[in-house]
């Protein structure tokens, strides 16, 4: 199958937003207008195409990043009538699913940031925005739900500037808001667009309504000033009062958008079919193609030398696996983004993370949960492979003759865990395998066994995250399980640096064991994890035993010295040691490393840490006092408050341990009128009284 469009006519985009901003409906409309759908689904009736898991249809939220492809010919702008391929990843808006957002942003070249014209910039908008900044993803902003009572386009633009620190530049201003939203003024062409009242998919082009002419002129001047700052030629023309063409404005806007120095802003109401076609024109006009993004950087798996791959079909094949999913019909699906070269179905690829070669049986182009077999996939495309057994999220797939490791994705550690046990013997046999499959799909979901109780523990990013995974066990894997109460994932660290000797000796006839190490144990800054440095001089410990010391330290870190929780943010330096010609072994040095670390950590002022959550509560005025009092009673620290969309909002940092059951308490406190969102912020030291209680619990467990 030949390439359908040139590479510069490809757009890999994501739809990113807060929950309820209208992402799934907007994506449905895109598919409808681009000819992929013949009937539009609605989220509220569970018929939306991109929400393809049962739980998504029931809950009306998007959990997995469904991928789809479609084609669009712009009606206006520099690309009129030129066919473009748009690959869309629909990302979730609930904070428990930030991993889905993170991995989709890693492989995108641009994004449409959706905002609700009533709610404005919500907490999850900020979270997703920060993630997009991290990857330098160019964005356009689409202010949706303009037909809703309380819609305010200009307030939302102001909030994008103030809360996100962005530079939003409206290319349209609305004609009417709320129930009287009728269309918009195109500030580049200085024309009015009035949508058909019965069906917003058709519209009339008119002169700008008389009562909006002054406002439109003001906003056009604002737009031209903002755009001309990014191009000297345009600035000179603007200052000299010369005419500036549409094409010139669009060209400079495109360059500024690609550098993320301008965010073009559009408006619409996807549910009423208003604005989506113009948003598609803007996707083509202003967002990046793989050619604009340029070469991808990586390194050679053996030599660590830097390697670059140009976005060309002629280059050796290189792709990043960004998502693993289990499909009930075809089995394991590996979604991947091709950065260079071409891949044919049936060919072999090298996974440079495992060093293994695997055959790709089939290549599928995904349309939400429907799939289409294709012969080959080209540079810049997103597709799914069937038949890859050992691939994990973030692995690089490439041509075995030109190996490369692309940048590895980094995911946050889980903050909440629950015990899980099978209901029956047959469930018991399948539970382990099913949990392993789910963990393979989701890097923020971890499965482990409690060493003391033998219980299986599952850990994730929040209560909803784990609830949905347990639900999937039942629906997809037919495994019934009982779950315990959620537990906080406490951690331990140290506050000062110490040196300590770890010695393991067993010499009582026959071959003995001997290993002696001197370690320096010191704190690292928060979030750095673990670092091991070998500073041994003069061969006092043979090279082959040093990895064993590191392994012993890491083993000891899994169960801390305060209350048995995993330790983090620690640097361990191996300074000195001794070995015995006959009795030393890897095992002896592993145990010596473990003893040395435990002894050092106990003297290094060890402390207990707890996860602190960033919480935002939106509440009617009359419940504000109760909400703030309640947050304070949960050891919360109020960080700010204000007014938004006719309600009060409160920002606070609260320990996760105090937030279990909060949704029920908030509902009863506000008669169901307040809502909240919560995301992990950082780990902080636990107050002494709580630390003592946890230590006591640990001691009583040990004595049992």
Swiss-Prot record:
Primary localization class, coarse: cytoplasm
Sorted alphabetically, which Gene3D superfamilies does this protein's record hold? 3.30.230.10, 3.30.70.240, Elongation Factor G (Translational Gtpase), domain 3, P-loop containing nucleotide triphosphate hydrolases, Translation factors
Any idea which positions bind GTP?
A: 17-24, 90-94, 144-147
Which SMART domains did the record assign?
EFG_C, EFG_IV
Residue ranges annotated for the tr-type G domain, each copy included:
8-291
**CDD domains per UniProt:** EF-G, EFG_III, EFG_mtEFG1_IV, EFG_mtEFG_C, EFG_mtEFG_II
What family does the Swiss-Prot or TrEMBL record give for this protein?
Belongs to the TRAFAC class translation factor GTPase superfamily. Classic translation factor GTPase family. EF-G/EF-2 subfamily.
User: Per its record, how is this protein called by name?
Assistant: Elongation factor G
From the broadest rank down, the organism's phylogenetic lineage runs: Bacteria, Pseudomonadati, Chlorobiota, Chlorobiia, Chlorobiales
Which gene is annotated as encoding this protein in its UniProt record? fusA
């Amino acid at each position: 199958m030949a390439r359908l469009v040139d590479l510069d006519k490809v757009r890999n985009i994501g739809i990113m937003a807060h929950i309820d901003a209208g992402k799934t409906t907007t994506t449905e409309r895109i598919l409808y207008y681009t000819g992929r759908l013949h009937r539009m689904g609605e989220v509220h009736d569970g018929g939306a195409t991109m929400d393809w898991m049962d739980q998504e249809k029931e809950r009306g939220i998007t959990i997995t990043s469904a991928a789809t492809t479609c084609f669009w010919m712009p009606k206006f702008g520099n690309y009129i009538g030129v066919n473009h391929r748009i690959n869309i990843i629909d990302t979730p808006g609930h904070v428990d699913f930030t991993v889905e957002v993170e991995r989709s942003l890693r492989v995108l070249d641009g994004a449409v940031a959706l905002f609700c014209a009533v709610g404005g910039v919500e907490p999850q908008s900020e979270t997703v925005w920060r993630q997009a900044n991290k990857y330098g993803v160019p964005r356009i902003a689409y202010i949706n739900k303009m037909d809703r009572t309380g819609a305010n386009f200009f307030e939302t633009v102001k909030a994008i500037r103030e809360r996100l620190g962005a530079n939003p530049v409206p290319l349209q201003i609305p004609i009417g808001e709320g129930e009287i939203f009728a269309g918009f003024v195109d500030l580049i062409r200085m024309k009015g667009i009035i949508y058909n009242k019965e069906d917003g998919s058709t519209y009339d082009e008119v002169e700008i309504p008389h009562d909006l002419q002054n406002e439109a002129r003001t906003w056009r001047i604002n737009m031209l000033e903002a755009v001309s700052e990014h191009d000297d030629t345009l600035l000179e023309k603007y200052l000299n009062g010369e005419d500036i063409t549409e094409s010139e404005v669009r060209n400079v806007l495109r360059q500024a958008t690609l550098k993320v120095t301008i965010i073009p802003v559009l408006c619409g109401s996807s549910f009423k079919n208003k604005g989506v076609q113009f948003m598609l024109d803007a996707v083509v006009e202003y967002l990046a193609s793989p050619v604009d993004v340029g070469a991808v950087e990586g390194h050679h798996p053996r030599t660590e030398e830097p390697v670059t791959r140009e976005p060309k079909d002629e280059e050796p094949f290189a792709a990043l696996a960004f998502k693993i999913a289990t499909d009930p019909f075809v089995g394991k699906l590996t979604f991947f983004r091709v950065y260079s070269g071409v891949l044919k179905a049936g060919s072999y690829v090298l996974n440079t993370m495992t060093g293994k070669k695997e055959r790709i049986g089939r290549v599928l182009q995904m349309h939400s949960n429907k799939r289409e077999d294709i012969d080959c996939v080209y540079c810049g495309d997103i597709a799914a492979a069937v038949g890859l057994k050992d691939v994990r999220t973030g692995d690089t797939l490439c041509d075995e003759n030109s190996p490369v490791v692309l940048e590895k994705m980094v995911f946050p550690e889980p903050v909440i865990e629950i015990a899980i046990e099978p209901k029956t013997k047959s469930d018991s046999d399948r539970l382990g395998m099913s949990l392993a499959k789910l963990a393979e799909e989701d890097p923020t979901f971890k499965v482990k066994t409690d060493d003391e109780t033998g219980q299986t523990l599952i850990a994730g990013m929040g209560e909803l995250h784990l609830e949905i995974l347990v639900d999937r066990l039942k629906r997809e894997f037919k495994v019934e399980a009982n779950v315990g109460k959620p537990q906080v994932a406490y951690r331990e660290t140290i506050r000062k640096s110490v040196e300590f000797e770890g010695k393991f000796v067993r010499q009582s006839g026959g071959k003995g064991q001997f290993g002696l190490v001197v370690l320096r144990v010191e704190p690292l800054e928060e979030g750095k994890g673990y670092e091991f440095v070998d500073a041994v001089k003069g061969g006092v410990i043979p090279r082959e035993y040093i990895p064993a010391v590191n392994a012993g330290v890491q083993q000891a870190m899994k169960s801390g010295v305060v209350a048995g929780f995993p330790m983090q943010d620690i640097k361990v330096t191996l300074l000195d040691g001794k070995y015995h010609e006959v009795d030393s072994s890897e095992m002896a040095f592993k145990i010596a490393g473990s003893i040395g670390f435990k002894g050092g950590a106990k003297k290094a002022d060890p402390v207990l840490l707890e996860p602190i959550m960033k919480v935002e509560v939106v509440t009617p005025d009359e419940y504000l006092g109760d909400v703030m009092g309640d947050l304070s009673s949960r050891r919360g620290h109020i960080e700010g408050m204000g007014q938004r969309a006719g309600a009060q909002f409160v920002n606070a940092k609260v320990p996760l341990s105090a937030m279990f059951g909060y949704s029920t308490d908030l509902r009863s406190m506000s008669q169901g009128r307040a809502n909240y969102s919560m995301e992990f912020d950082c780990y902080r030291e636990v107050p002494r009284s709580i630390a003592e209680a946890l230590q006591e619990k640990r001691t009583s467990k040990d004595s049992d």
